[in-house]
């Protein structure tokens, strides 16, 4: 037995030999730190494993690291992100501090790179996206890490990144600059090792650039056994780019490893970079990061049953925001376990955020993780079994873009394949290929953007393809705005204003708004009414106004063409061929 008073909240469990502190059983040692051991622990009521970091007070005081530990605890308690290690509880005794943390079993990213060498591009990008998401979350909560390196990036059982070790982190105050030189030399920014003042986020992003280089190359951009020589290399900002590195990846790294922090890429620039956006999961950068208001009812019920309390007691503890309340701790453990234990962990982590759908142009199915509650896959399947008759089918291309951004994407895509179009309303156009001597009257396709019926749990919009109706054919030119390749200056202007990423705007769910065109369940609407209601809802800064002013009559379009094409057998075949060309353009990266 330990000396009396040493573990004032610890008792021996009868017949097991293990010690208990609070609601946790302390088991075997799984690691060692500078201030004590790291033990595996188990939450008694839920049975979930945790990591218990034991910090010896005397050792911390002797090494002068009390403030470092206090920073880590204070900052971790503020952070709740799927790619940052969770701190569930802090238990203090006269001699030790016990940090009950998320158990991350996959080891360090550093060991992983050392073992495998340069990582595949796709894997590196996935890790980097998760790192930037976590770092951005920290910065949004006014916390700068200041010691980002592969040794402080852990991998969980599903090979997801977990940012750890916030001991050198600091809380940022508006208007204040930091001056402490800290962090690991190989990953430290020039201003940090030069004892210059810095705001904070820029030093983390420099470190992220070094980490990305290390993942792609298996080596460091700045390395030398002699520290003064190493510092000189870092301050010069010169490093070798391997011939095998992708140009876009090299370009992104170069924007992050800028010696001048003013010129260094910020999070927004990184996220909008074309290399970074490939296969970017929506949950990493959601519109709403306020997950504190989301309560998983299933978990509330489970916790209430395990502790033999009412569900109101659990929700009351959550609303009181008492993070050390035993019901809050059990709730967070349950939620964390559900997210990490799911085989498709990406979708499970998406449920962590209050989001609509992780959708891209061209997605034709409803993904699991499409609502604001966790365990959605099971609920969707159960709902389909119970309500087979309520199943709704949609034919077309679904998107969760802002409707105006969707139409900008459509216009740019049509321009890329040299199509012509006539605008019936802001979200309804007629499209055709350019006339040729062989085919002077190409078949026309009607493209219309519909708001999906929210009553059927559908969110987002549907771009519908159809043949022309008589009413659409009869609309006089005076009531339409048409456009040809001569308006490319307007589109180029919009594209440049969007940093060249207009055609790859992130698909994000919208806040509630009026239907932008007939709902899928209300197909009839007059063009005038739809046009008027839509114009009133548009923001004046949108480039659609520029596109409108540049429209010319379709009758005046030049019919100059390149080499004549072979005639198409029928109007039906030509219609589907035109639709195929448009879809390919819309779905092109």
Curated annotation (Swiss-Prot):
ATP binds at residues 30-38, 53. Residues 24-276 form the Protein kinase domain. It catalyses: L-seryl-[protein] + ATP = O-phospho-L-seryl-[protein] + ADP + H(+); L-threonyl-[protein] + ATP = O-phospho-L-threonyl-[protein] + ADP + H(+). It holds the Pfam family Pkinase. The keyword ATP-binding applies. Disruption phenotype: Reduced survival as a result of hyperosmotic stress induced by NaCl. Double knockout with aak-2 results in reduced glycogen accumulation. The keyword ATP-binding applies. Keywords: ATP-binding, Kinase, Nucleotide-binding, Serine/threonine-protein kinase, Transferase. GO terms for biological process: cellular response to glucose starvation; negative regulation of cell population proliferation; negative regulation of TORC1 signaling; nematode pharyngeal pumping; positive regulation of autophagy; protein localization to lipid droplet. One of its GO terms (molecular function) is protein serine/threonine kinase activity. Its EC number is 2.7.11.1. PROSITE patterns: PROTEIN_KINASE_ATP, PROTEIN_KINASE_DOM, PROTEIN_KINASE_ST. One of its GO terms (cellular component) is nucleus. Probably does not act as a sensor that couples lifespan to information about energy levels and insulin-like signals. Together with aak-2, involved in the establishment of germline stem cell (GSC) quiescence during dauer development. Plays a role in the maintenance of glycogen stores which are necessary for resistance to hyperosmotic stress. PANTHER family: MAP/MICROTUBULE AFFINITY-REGULATING KINASE, NON-SPECIFIC SERINE_THREONINE PROTEIN KINASE. Belongs to the protein kinase superfamily. CAMK Ser/Thr protein kinase family. SNF1 subfamily. This is 5'-AMP-activated protein kinase catalytic subunit alpha-1. The lineage of its organism: Eukaryota, Metazoa, Ecdysozoa, Nematoda, Chromadorea.
């Amino acid at each position: 037995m330990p000396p009396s008073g040493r573990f004032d909240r610890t008792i021996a469990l009868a017949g097991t030999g293990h010690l208990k502190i609070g609601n946790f059983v302390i088991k075997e040692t799984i690691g060692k730190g500078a201030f004590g051991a790291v033990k595996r622990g188990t939450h008694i009521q839920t049975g979930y494993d945790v990591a218990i970091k034991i910090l010896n007070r005397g050792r911390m005081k002797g090494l002068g690291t009390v403030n470092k530990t206090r920073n880590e605890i204070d900052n971790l308690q503020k952070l709740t992100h799927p790619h940052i290690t969770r701190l569930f509880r802090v238990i203090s005794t006269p001699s030790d501090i016990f940090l009950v943390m998320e158990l991350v079993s996959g080891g360090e990213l550093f060991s992983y790179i050392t073992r495998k060498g340069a990582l595949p591009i796709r894997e590196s990008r996935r890790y980097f996206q998760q790192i930037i998401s976590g770092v951005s979350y920290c910065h949004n909560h006014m916390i700068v890490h200041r010691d980002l390196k592969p040794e402080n990036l852990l991998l969980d059982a599903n090979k997801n990144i977990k940012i750890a070790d916030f001991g050198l982190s600091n809380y940022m105050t508006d208007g204040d600059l930091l001056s402490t030189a800290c962090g690991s030399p190989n990953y430290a920014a020039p201003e940090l090792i030069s004892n210059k003042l810095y705001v904070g986020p820029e030093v983390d992003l420099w470190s992220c650039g070094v980490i990305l280089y290390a993942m792609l190359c298996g080596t460091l951009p700045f390395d030398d056994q002699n520290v003064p020589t190493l510092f000189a290399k870092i301050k010069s900002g010169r490093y070798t780019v391997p011939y095998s590195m992708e140009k876009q990846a090299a370009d992104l790294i170069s924007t992050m490893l800028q010696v001048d922090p003013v010129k260094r890429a910020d999070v927004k620039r990184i996220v909008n970079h074309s290399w970074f956006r490939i296969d970017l999961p929506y949950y990493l950068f959601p519109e709403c990061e306020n997950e504190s208001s989301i309560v998983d009812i299933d978990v509330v019920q489970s916790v209430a049953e395990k502790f033999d309390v009412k569900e109101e007691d659990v929700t009351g503890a959550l609303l009181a925001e008492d993070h050390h309340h035993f019901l809050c701790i059990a709730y967070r453990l349950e939620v964390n376990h559900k997210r990490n234990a799911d085989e498709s962990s990406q979708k499970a982590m998406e449920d962590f955020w209050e989001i609509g759908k992780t959708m891209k142009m061209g997605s034709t199915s409803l993904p699991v993780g499409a609502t604001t509650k966790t365990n959605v896959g099971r609920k969707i399947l159960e709902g389909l079994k119970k309500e087979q008759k309520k199943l709704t089918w949609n034919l077309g291309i679904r998107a969760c873009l802002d409707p105006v951004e969707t139409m900008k994407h459509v216009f740019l895509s049509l321009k890329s394949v040299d199509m012509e179009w006539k605008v019936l309303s802001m979200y309804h156009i007629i499209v055709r290929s350019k006339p040729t001597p062989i085919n002077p009257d190409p078949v026309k396709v009607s493209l219309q953007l519909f708001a999906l019926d929210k009553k059927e749990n559908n969110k987002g919009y549907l771009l519908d393809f159809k043949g022309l109706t008589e009413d659409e054919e009869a609309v006089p030119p005076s009531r339409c705005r048409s456009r040809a390749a001569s308006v490319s200056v307007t589109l180029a202007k919009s594209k440049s204003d969007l940093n060249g990423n207009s055609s790859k705007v992130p698909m994000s769910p919208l806040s509630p708004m009026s239907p932008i065109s007939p709902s899928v369940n209300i197909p009839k609407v007059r063009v005038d009414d739809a046009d008027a209601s839509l114009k009133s809802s548009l923001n004046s800064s949108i480039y659609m106004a520029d596109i409108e002013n540049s429209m010319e009559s379709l009758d005046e379009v030049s019919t100059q063409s390149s080499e004549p094409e072979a005639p198409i057998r029928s109007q039906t075949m030509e219609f589907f061929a035109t639709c195929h060309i448009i879809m390919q353009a819309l779905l092109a990266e």
